[in-house]
Curated annotation (Swiss-Prot):
Function: Cytokine that plays important roles in allergic inflammation and immune response to parasite infection. Synergizes with IL2 in regulating interferon-gamma synthesis. Stimulates B-cell proliferation, and activation of eosinophils, basophils, and mast cells. Plays an important role in controlling IL33 activity by modulating the production of transmembrane and soluble forms of interleukin-1 receptor-like 1/IL1RL1.
Protein family according to the UniProt entry: Belongs to the IL-4/IL-13 family.
Signal sequence annotation: 1-18
Subunit structure: Interacts with IL13RA2.
Gene coding for it: IL13
UniProt-recorded name of the protein: Interleukin-13
GO CC list: extracellular space
Keyword tags: Cytokine, Disulfide bond, Glycoprotein, Secreted, Signal
Subcellular location: Secreted
BP GO annotations: immune response; inflammatory response; positive regulation of immunoglobulin production
InterPro entries: 4_helix_cytokine-like_core, IL-13, IL-4/IL-13, IL-4/IL-13_CS
Glycan attachment positions: 38, 49, 57, 72
Disulfide partners: 48-76, 64-90
């Protein structure tokens, strides 16, 4: 009986080692890039009905700034997965209406153009090995 109990406890403890670990940032970035590629390639109608978002400064804090812009687009299922993925990169909680200093305050662009610009920038970061 003691041997059985010891075996059960050992297997329970070792089970924690086999649990899934967080996805590496490089893999998460690659998946985000693939999602943006899918969005840009599968455009038959204007993305998000031609909704406009604030342009962002792509040189710093790109993930949170991109999420802050996209979070204000409602009723667009095409970018919901992208929003969730960006949320994983952003260390703080982003809510609709939040304003970042990283946005170019006077410039709004269509979501489709925003996604294309973001895709180009993220591909560049991936090539350079900058995953943060």
């Amino acid at each position: 009986m003691a041997l059985l109990l010891t075996t059960v406890i050992a297997l329970t403890c070792l089970g924690g080692f086999a649990s899934p670990s967080p996805v590496p940032r490089s893999t998460a970035l690659k998946e985000l890039i693939e999602e943006l590629v899918n969005i840009t390639q599968n455009q038959k109608a204007p993305l998000c009905n031609g909704s406009m978002v604030w342009s962002i400064n792509l040189t710093a804090g790109v993930y949170c700034a991109a999420l802050e812009s996209l979070i204000n687009v409602s009723g667009c299922s095409a970018i919901e997965k992208t929003q969730r993925m960006l949320n994983g990169f952003c260390p703080h909680k982003v809510s609709a209406g939040q304003f970042s200093s990283l946005r170019v305050r006077d410039t709004k662009i269509e979501v489709a153009q925003f996604v294309k610009d973001l895709l180009v920038h993220l591909k560049k970061l991936f090539r350079e090995g900058r995953f943060n």
